[in-house]
From Swiss-Prot:
PROSITE patterns reported in the protein's UniProt record: DEAD_ATP_HELICASE, HELICASE_ATP_BIND_1, HELICASE_CTER, Q_MOTIF
Amino-acid positions noted as binding ATP in the UniProt annotation, renumbered to this chain: 143-150
GO molecular function, one term: RNA helicase activity
Name of the molecule in the record: ATP-dependent RNA helicase DBP10
The species this protein was found in: Candida albicans (strain SC5314 / ATCC MYA-2876) (Yeast)
């Protein structure tokens, strides 16, 4: 497409009234099923005055911002910058409204694909990043999950590449998970419809030979996971110097999953003039360091920095005892969410769905093959996915568990309880993963049990509820979990089950979010104070589940009923019991490897446990057992308290021992009580100041693990320091808030990592280390061997880093030799896209008794003339010998001469 056509977009579009369209969608690449209905007032560009023209169904919808958007001064400034940029570079862009897709200077076919997707207006992250990306700048984009980040980098990518060019890969998109890679690949295919751009997806779990074939076609765009892409790059020794555009999608997740070495290795093999984009929901310090090293003068674009979770999200936290977590889960599903049980018809339909193939590509291939064979193929009724802004089912719920063993255990438990359940974990087969996800999205199942691999990347636009079976150790993981609900302006609930060991992590979450914990006793005390101070009719305050972390327990009577149900299921099903034991072992390892909570939260958790933290939750209204509890409290506060040793009074020595013990503990208890009362008074007076006070009183604290000054110094538009204190040298008397928040955003806090970071080794200048040989006895070899010789083998890459030797196993060389292909090269012309075999085989020998005797005879004669060895026929000698033949003949002649040219006996 020529440049003139690209510039003449705005003039060729029939724009509609901006009042006919709603606000912009916040989904980043989901399929919208909404119809684009043309307005009745819309007319053709030059209608005749006599007749009233019909609305044009092919007209492009209005893409400008609504009146409600763009009221902020920052948005107006950004829109003016965008408009001025495109007016200077595109004369026809003056007709397009500022902030619309048309004003970005996108070509006509891209705008048409946007219309097919149902997008009407760009989201804020798209309005701010697309102009910068099209300028060629390196961008670091920060926005919440579901804000449209995928389209923000896919649209400029297609605009820049435009059409197919032979020579090598030009764009690489790195995703942390297989699901996110497939979802991004789907968006790339949809937005590039109408072009000849070739794109492929490379994910783990697929055949290496298939990936070899894909890479040999030298596509324009590669959507991949880092592990598989680096494996193919090292195995094939693939040249990436043609890459112009690289995207790190969900970059913080890439670092969490341990892809830092792969990313650094890939960066070293890319050209220096590439354009790099980094999109993330949060920005920990390790990611800032990576951006400094891998990006050139990057521009930081931040949205929603002040809020970490949606303001439409309501949260409830339920306390549990050691063996009552499953009963709490069953109670939440049955009584709180009102989850319906599955009928026999639904279960039968679910079993039939397991038989069908969800992968559309494989279905198309099977259809073509069976159509060629003339076979009839039974076709299932195709279920249509709901629109992206509609719930899969009214009770759609995701249950997050810590390990894959918990996934199997909880899935089996809920299915035996009668619920329709799907499940996904990291090592699940790719086809089974698609099948389970499809069943949930269609609405055949209401519950999806997953590990943290589904916190991102799984294509579920809107959810009703999220349940945390266990509270995660990192507050950042919690944010990504609950980010699956309350999206696009919809309300949602997040329920979390918390025990005593997880309470410190809840306090860390309180500090991280800046939202205080609300106990039932605290709320009742507040109500009593307001009731005493009110003069007229008293209206109790409404509990705000959005701004407070409301903590409490499930009603005890109902919980005991569900506990009996759980024990009955456990007693009657041996498989659930086995899965529970396996999950318990996995949970021990999980607790051993998770990062510890902060010391401040550990201290505060003891105080909260003592202050009736497990009272009935405010969500369930008035406590019916309150009178019984009050009676028990009266018994506890009686004057004469006797222990079991003093009841009968038979042994006077025990009675004397208990009295002496009371006298010893009395002053300690009195001092502890006075200290508690003093701390409570000081807190009310505002005299104390600690980490929690700094967090809860701070204004504009973003909580992303990196200070504002550090972000401004690392990226563009750095401001001057506003304080006389230099943060590099100033030492406070208490640990600052960033310490807690950095711990929540850190990847690992193990001693090995901290010790490695603190190591100061002067001998490691050029990676030469003195390896200390540790010998051990090998039973098989019967001798002492070096213990390091049994470790995993590595190879040194071009960047100097160690890569597993399995990455270069020679599989590609074998695959290439079998097909007689040349090594990969970026300068070859691959316009024909076919590989012609050059193998020559001897033809069949002619048979006199067959009709094709003369034909085969001619083939044999032709093969002999061309030098092919045919059995029973002598190949004609070549008239001109090659240099190798001359050399061999000369050597043979010298050998014969040395052997035979001896003096004869007659001369003696």
């Amino acid at each position: 497409m020529s440049d003139d056509e690209a510039f003449d977009i705005a003039g060729s579009l029939a724009l509609k009234d901006e009042d006919d369209y709603s606000d912009s969608s916040s989904n980043e690449g989901e399929d919208f099923q909404d119809e684009i209905i043309p307005s009745d007032d819309e007319k053709e560009p030059s209608p005749p005055p006599k007749k009233k023209s019909k609305p044009n169904p092919q007209a492009f919808p209005s893409l400008e911002l609504s009146d409600n958007e763009g009221n902020n001064d920052d948005d107006d400034d950004d829109d003016s910058k965008i408009n001025s940029y495109f007016i200077n570079n595109n004369p026809t862009a003056k007709k397009a409204k500022a902030g619309s897709f048309a004003s970005f200077g996108l070509t006509k076919f891209i705008l048409a694909n946007i219309a097919k997707k149902g997008y009407k207006q760009p989201t804020p992250i798209q309005r701010k990043t697309i102009p910068l990306i099209m300028e060629g700048r390196d961008v670091v984009g920060m926005a919440r999950t579901g804000s449209g980040k995928t389209a923000a980098f896919v649209l400029p990518l297609i605009e820049r590449l435009k059409s197919r060019q032979p020579g090598g890969v030009r764009a690489v998109i790195l995703s942390p998970s297989r699901e996110l890679a497939l979802q991004t690949y789907k968006q790339v295919k949809e937005f590039s419809h109408g072009t000849n751009l070739q794109s492929i997806v490379l994910i783990g779990g697929d055949s290496l030979e298939e990936d070899f074939s894909k890479m040999m076609t030298k596509p324009d765009i590669i959507v991949c996971t880092p592990g598989r892409f680096l494996h193919l790059k090292v195995e094939m020794q693939y040249d990436l110097m043609t890459v112009q555009y690289i995207v790190f999608d969900e970059a913080d997740r890439l670092f969490e999953m341990g892809f830092a070495e792969q990313l650094n290795e890939l960066l070293a093999s890319l050209p220096s003039n590439r354009q790099s984009l980094l999109f993330s929901a949060t920005l920990p310090r390790s990611l800032v360091d990576f951006a400094k090293a891998g990006l050139t003068n990057p521009v930081l674009v931040r949205l929603d920095a002040e809020s970490k979770i949606s303001d439409q999200l309501q949260m409830a936290y339920f306390t549990t005892k050691k063996n009552e977590r499953e009963a709490n889960l069953l109670y939440i599903l049955q009584e709180v969410i009102k989850m319906p049980l599955g009928s026999e018809e639904q279960i039968k339909k679910l079993k039939d769905m397991d038989k069908r193939k969800i992968d559309s590509d494989s279905e198309d291939d099977d259809d073509d093959e069976e159509r060629k064979k003339g076979k009839k193929r039974y076709k299932f009724k195709k279920e249509r996915l709901p629109p992206a802004n509609r719930l899969p089912s009214p009770h759609s719920t995701i249950v997050f568990v810590p390990t894959k063993h918990h996934v199997e255990y909880v899935t089996k438990l809920l299915r035996d309880a009668g619920y329709l359940v799907s499940y996904i974990y990291g090592t699940l087969d790719q086809h089974a993963r698609k099948n389970q996800l499809y069943q949930f999205r269609v609405g055949l199942t209401n519950v999806l049990v997953v590990t943290d691999v589904a916190a991102r990347g799984i294509d579920i636009p809107v959810l009703a509820n999220v349940i945390n079976f266990t509270l995660p150790a990192s507050s950042k993981i919690f944010i990504h979990r609950v980010g699956r609900t309350a999206r696009a302006g919809n309300k949602g609930w997040a329920y979390s089950i918390v025990n005593e060991k997880e309470l410190p992590y809840l306090l860390d979450l309180e500090l991280f979010l800046g939202k205080k914990i609300l106990l039932t006793s605290m709320h009742e005390a507040k109500v009593e104070m307001l009731k005493k101070s009110s003069t007229g009719t008293f209206i109790p305050p409404v509990v705000n589940y959005t701004e407070r972390l409301v903590l409490g327990s499930v009603p005890r009577v109902d919980l005991e009923t569900f506990q009996e149900l759980y024990e009955n299921l456990l007693r009657n099903n041996y498989e659930i019991k086995v899965l529970k034991d396996v999950a318990a072992k996995g949970e021990k390892l999980y607790h051993r490897t998770r990062q510890p909570a902060s010391q401040e939260s550990l201290k505060r958790s003891k105080e909260i446990i003592e202050s009736s933290w497990d009272d009935q939750h405010l969500l369930f209204g008035e406590n019916l057992e309150k009178q019984k509890d009050a009676f028990l409290a009266k018994l506890q506060d009686r004057n004469s308290k006797q222990t079991v040793f003093e009841l009968k009074g038979s042994d006077e020595s025990l009675v004397e021992f208990m009295n002496r013990r009371r006298r010893q503990l009395a002053p300690i208890q009195r001092k502890a009580k006075e200290r508690k009362e003093l701390l409570a008074k000081e807190r009310l007076a505002g005299l104390t100041h600690g980490i929690e006070d700094e967090i809860l009183r701070a204004d504009g604290e973003n909580g992303y693990g990196v200070d504002e000054d550090e972000l401004q110094e690392a990226f563009e538009d750095a401001d001057k320091k506003k304080s006389f204190r230099d943060p590099q040298f100033f030492l406070s008397h208490y640990a600052p808030a960033s310490v807690i928040q950095d711990q929540q955003l850190s990847l690992s806090t193990s001693f090995a990592n901290e010790a490695q970071a603190a190591t100061f080794d002067l001998d490691n200048d050029d990676k030469i280390q003195t390896n200390k040989q540790v010998m051990r006895w090998d039973k098989k070899k019967g001798k002492y061997i070096n213990s390091k010789s049994t470790d995993k083998k590595y190879i040194i890459s071009e960047n100097g880093t160690k890569i597993p030797a399995s990455f270069r196993s020679g599989k590609f060389d074998e695959w290439r030799k079998q097909r007689n292909l040349k090594p990969t090269s970026t300068v070859e012309d691959d316009s024909n896209k076919r590989f012609k075999h050059k193998q020559q085989r001897a033809p069949k020998l002619p048979d006199k008794f067959r009709d094709d005797y003369h034909k085969q005879k001619k083939k044999v004669e032709k093969a002999i003339e061309s030098g092919v060895n045919v059995k029973g026929f002598h190949t004609p000698q070549q008239e001109i010998k090659s240099t190798e033949q001359i050399r061999k003949a000369r050597l043979l002649k010298e050998k014969r001469k040395a052997k035979n040219a001896r003096p004869s006996k007659k001369r003696k």
